[in-house]
């Protein structure tokens, strides 16, 4: 029994460690890459969030003869959240505006991935900005959930 618990804890630690190193939140989507990206754009527009660009990486790769599974990136931002975060630690600006990657894995599963705000908090040694980090976490999770499910 102790051995089983130890193995389970070791596996859990490894998963948590890999998640922390990765710095990404990955949310499965029931829709295609294009439809998921369309849904994200629609949600952002409804919320009045600025969309700076939508990059179809797989399309660009195809233009130079490289086959790439569907991969799109949406770059967006809201100065009401980003500016207070930069005021706490200006170096976080290198990771802003926010980005959401919508991609298809080797098993044809579609994912929404974005930078974990807690990872950015650690990366930039952000202190005294808990309320802003929580708002960003909630906003990104809400967008991903709404875009990925019925």
Predicted regions and their residues:
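Terminal, regulation- and interaction-focused segments at domain boundaries
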Residues: 13-51, 55
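Sec-dependent N-terminal signal peptides
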Residues: 6-10
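Positively charged n-region of N-terminal signal peptides that target proteins for export
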Residues: 1-4
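Compact, glycine-rich, soluble single-domain proteins
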Residues: 41, 45, 52, 56-98, ...
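Stable alpha-helical elements in mature extracytoplasmic
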Residues: 36, 40, 57, 132, ...
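Beta-strand/loop substructures that line and gate deep hydrophobic ligand-binding cavities in soluble
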Residues: 99-126
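C-terminal partner/receptor-binding element of secreted or periplasmic proteins
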Residues: 118-150
């Amino acid at each position: 029994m102790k051995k089983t618990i130890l193995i389970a804890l070791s596996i859990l630690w490894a998963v948590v460690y890999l998640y922390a190193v990765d710095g990404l939140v990955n949310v499965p989507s029931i829709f295609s890459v294009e439809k998921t990206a369309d849904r994200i754009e629609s949600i952002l527009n409804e919320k009045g969030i600025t969309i700076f660009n939508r990059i179809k990486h797989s399309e660009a790769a195809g233009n130079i003869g490289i086959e790439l599974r569907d991969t799109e990136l949406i770059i967006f931002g809201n100065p009401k959240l980003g500016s207070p975060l930069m005021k706490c630690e200006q170096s976080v600006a290198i990771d802003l505006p926010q980005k959401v990657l919508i991609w298809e894995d080797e098993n044809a599963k579609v994912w929404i991935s974005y930078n974990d705000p807690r990872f950015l908090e650690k990366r930039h040694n952000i202190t005294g900005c808990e309320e802003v980090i929580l708002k960003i976490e909630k906003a990104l999770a809400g967008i991903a959930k709404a875009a990925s499910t019925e």
